[in-house]
C-alpha cells in the first residue's frame, strides 16, 4: 500500500447494518401487529404490514448507501483520517503513533461474505473507554492494511524470524476446563439452594394428586433451568475461546480465538499497562489461574467480559507461558506481599456502627408499619453483620500489596481472588484516603489509575501502613 491512500468500507457493511435494523423493525411490527388484532389477519392486513416493513427496510438501505458512499478512510501525513460527508459533516483525525491496537474480528455473516472487521484503538486517556474506528474490508485487504498500520506505528523493528517466534495454544479439553473454572461461587450457591429447596418436595411427592404432580413438574423445570444456565455458561466460554492461539513476534503479541465470532488481537507489548491473574473459588480450589492484560482496546465490547490473554491453567504452565510471551513483566508467583494489619478491623467496625445507627431506626419504622414486631429489627441486622464479617475476614486474609524494584503486585478478593502486576512507570496517578480512625492506626487506602478502558482504569488499593504508601508514592515518581 502507498501513503496518502483513500478508500471506502467494503460494500457489505450496508447489508450487514440493514439486516440488523430490518430484523429489529420486523420484530417490533410483528409483535405490535399480532397483539392488536382480535381476529385472524386478512390478506389486506398482511399486505399493509409487509408494505410498511419493506418501506422501512428500503429507507434504511438508502440511508446506509448514502453513508457508505460519502464516508472515506485515508492516511495523510502519518495520520488516519475518517471523513463522513453526510447531513452532518465530520472529520476524525487520529495520529498513527497513538494507535495502540489493530484488531480483526469476523462474525458468521462476515465469514460467509469473506470480509473482516478491522478495529483500531487509541492509547489516549480521553478515548480509552471506546473503540475509535471500525473498518470493514475483504479479509486479505484487511490483513494487509493491518500489517501496514503496524509497520507505521511500530515502536521497535518487528522480528519475522521464526526462531524469535514464541507460540502457545490451548486444546479443546483445556478450553472446556477453562469454562468450568470460570463458574463463580454465586452461581454454584444459587443452584445448590434451588436443588435443596425442591428436593423435599420431590421426596414427598405422592402419585395421586394433580396439584402435587404440577408442583413436581415445576420443580424439575426450575432445576433444569438453573443447570442449563450453568451448562450454557461453560458452552459459551468453550465456543468463544475455541481454537485459541497466542504468539509473541518481536515487540507484539498476536492473539486469536473463537469459531462463531473470530477475534484477532494485535497487542504492542509496550502498550500493556498491567497483567492480571484471576481465580474464581473453583479455580482457587483447583490451583488454576487465568490471565488478562490491561491496555486500551481489549475488553471494551459489551459481550467481552474480560481482556482475555491466557485460559485457566496450572500455576507452572501459566508461569512458563508468561515468561515466554511477556518476559518484561518478570511475574513472580511466590511473592505474597504485605497484609493490611489488624488496625483495619477498627476502621471497618467504625463504618459498620455508623451504618447500623442509620439502618436500625429505618427497620424499626418498617416493623411498626408492617406489624412484624422486633423480629425484623433484630434479625436483619444480625444477618447483615454475619455476612459483612465473612466478607471482611476473607478480604483481610486475601488483600495484600508487594512493592518490587520495577513493579508492584496487588492481591485482592473474597472467595474469588485476583493478582494485578503493574509497572510503576505505567501508573498514571494515585489518590490516597484516610478517615479519622485510619489515621489513628496509621493506615491508608487509595486508588491507582491506568491508561485503559473504563472498567479497567481504576484499581483499588487496600488499607496499608502509611510508610508503605509513602514508599509507593516515591516509586511512582
Please state what every model-predicted region is.
Residues 1-477:
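N-terminal basic, Ser/Thr-rich segments that initiate or prime the first beta/alpha elements at protein or domain
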Amino acid at each position: 500500500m502507498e501513503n496518502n491512500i483513500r478508500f471506502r468500507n467494503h460494500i457489505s457493511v450496508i447489508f450487514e447494518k440493514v439486516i440488523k435494523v430490518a430484523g429489529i423493525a420486523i420484530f417490533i411490527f410483528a409483535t405490535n401487529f399480532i397483539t392488536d388484532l382480535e381476529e385472524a389477519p386478512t390478506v389486506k392486513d398482511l399486505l399493509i404490514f409487509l408494505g410498511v416493513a419493506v418501506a422501512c427496510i428500503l429507507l434504511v438501505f438508502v440511508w446506509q448507501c448514502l453513508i457508505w458512499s460519502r464516508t472515506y478512510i485515508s492516511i495523510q501525513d502519518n495520520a488516519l483520517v475518517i471523513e463522513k460527508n453526510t447531513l452532518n459533516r465530520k472529520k476524525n483525525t487520529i495520529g498513527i503513533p497513538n494507535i495502540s491496537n489493530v484488531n480483526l474480528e469476523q462474525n458468521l455473516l462476515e465469514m460467509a461474505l469473506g470480509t473482516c472487521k478491522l478495529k483500531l484503538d487509541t492509547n489516549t486517556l480521553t478515548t480509552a473507554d471506546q473503540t475509535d474506528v471500525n473498518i470493514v474490508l475483504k479479509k486479505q485487504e484487511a490483513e494487509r492494511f493491518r500489517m501496514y498500520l503496524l509497520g507505521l506505528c511500530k515502536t521497535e523493528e518487528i522480528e519475522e524470524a521464526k526462531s524469535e517466534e514464541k507460540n502457545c495454544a490451548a486444546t479443546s479439553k483445556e478450553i472446556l476446563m477453562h469454562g468450568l473454572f470460570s463458574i463463580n461461587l454465586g452461581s454454584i450457591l444459587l443452584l445448590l439452594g434451588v436443588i435443596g429447596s425442591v428436593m423435599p418436595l420431590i421426596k414427598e411427592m405422592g402419585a395421586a394428586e394433580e396439584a402435587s404432580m404440577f408442583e413436581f413438574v415445576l420443580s424439575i423445570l426450575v432445576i433444569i433451568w438453573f443447570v442449563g444456565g450453568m451448562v450454557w455458561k461453560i458452552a459459551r466460554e468453550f465456543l468463544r475461546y475455541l481454537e485459541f492461539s497466542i504468539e509473541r513476534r518481536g515487540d507484539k503479541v498476536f492473539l486469536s480465538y473463537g469459531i462463531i465470532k473470530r477475534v484477532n488481537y494485535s497487542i504492542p507489548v509496550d502498550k500493556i499497562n498491567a497483567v492480571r491473574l484471576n481465580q474464581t473459588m473453583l479455580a482457587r480450589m483447583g490451583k488454576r489461574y487465568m490471565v488478562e492484560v490491561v491496555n486500551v482496546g481489549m475488553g471494551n465490547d459489551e459481550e467481552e467480559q474480560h481482556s482475555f490473554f491466557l485460559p485457566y491453567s496450572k500455576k507452572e504452565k501459566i508461569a512458563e507461558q508468561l515468561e515466554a510471551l511477556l518476559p518484561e513483566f518478570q511475574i513472580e508467583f511466590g511473592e505474597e506481599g504485605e497484609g493490611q494489619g489488624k488496625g483495619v478491623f477498627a476502621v471497618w467496625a467504625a463504618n459498620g456502627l455508623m451504618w447500623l445507627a442509620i439502618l436500625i431506626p429505618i427497620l424499626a419504622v418498617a416493623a411498626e408499619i408492617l406489624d412484624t414486631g422486633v423480629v425484623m429489627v433484630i434479625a436483619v441486622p444480625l444477618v447483615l453483620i454475619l455476612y459483612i464479617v465473612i466478607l471482611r475476614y476473607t478480604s483481610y486474609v486475601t488483600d495484600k500489596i508487594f512493592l518490587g524494584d520495577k513493579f508492584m503486585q496487588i492481591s485482592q478478593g473474597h472467595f474469588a481472588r485476583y493478582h494485578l502486576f503493574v509497572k510503576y512507570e505505567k501508573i498514571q496517578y494515585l489518590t490516597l484516603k484516610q478517615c479519622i480512625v485510619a489515621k489513628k492506626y496509621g493506615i491508608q487506602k487509595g486508588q491507582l489509575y491506568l491508561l485503559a478502558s473504563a472498567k479497567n482504569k481504576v484499581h483499588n488499593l487496600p488499607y496499608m501502613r502509611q510508610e508503605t504508601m509513602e514508599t509507593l508514592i516515591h516509586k511512582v515518581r
